[in-house]
Amino acid sequence: QGAEINVDDYINFLNEYDEGVEICCQWDTIPVGVEPEVASQQTWDNYWYMRERLKSPEKLLYVFHEGEDYKWLEKALQHDEITYIALGGVAKKPFKIRDKFFETCFEIISKVKPTVKTHAFGMTNRKLLEKYPFTSADSTSWMYPAKFGTIQWGDWKIVNVSERQVESPDHVYN
């Protein structure tokens, strides 16, 4: 985020490690600080630019972001080549916004191309993962508890493991 990376360098990297890559994300433009229509067009153009240059273009995920016009999602779903999409731009958005975004996306998907695979980008909220038929998901939220000396234990329970918090009622030794 915020780093300058060359799209051709990214393509070369993906081609070099193609055998070890199951799926990969396209070079996208998130509509933050950029007009959504401009971001959508850049994302669309970058998808096809990358697809033409990858050893395994079928591994490339098209990315549709919260805040973009849903016509871009519909457009992507109408292409036979696009079999796996990522739904993103929701990482720091409130639950209600994410829920409404996914609800609308999956309504469109069910009408246009119900067989498309979907990836939740930057989102591993359990309620949303159980509510919508995602194929895959990712986020960095699993790392945050460790910053505070806690870990996830079993079925989503957070327990304290910090030596500084031994007296805490949620400490693993208590």
What annotation goes with each model-predicted range?
Residues 11-14, 44-52, 73-77, 102-110, ...:
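Short amphipathic alpha-helical segments and helix-helix/interface helices
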Residues 133-134, 152:
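Short, glycine/charged-enriched secondary-structure capping and boundary segments
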Residues 28-38, 59-125, 141-167:
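Glycine/Thr-rich beta-alpha phosphate-binding loop at enzyme active sites
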Residues 124-133:
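Acidic, divalent-metal-coordinating active-site segment for phosphoryl/phosphodiester hydrolysis
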Residues 1-48, 52-55, 133:
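Non-catalytic, usually N-terminal nucleic-acid engagement modules in DNA/RNA processing proteins
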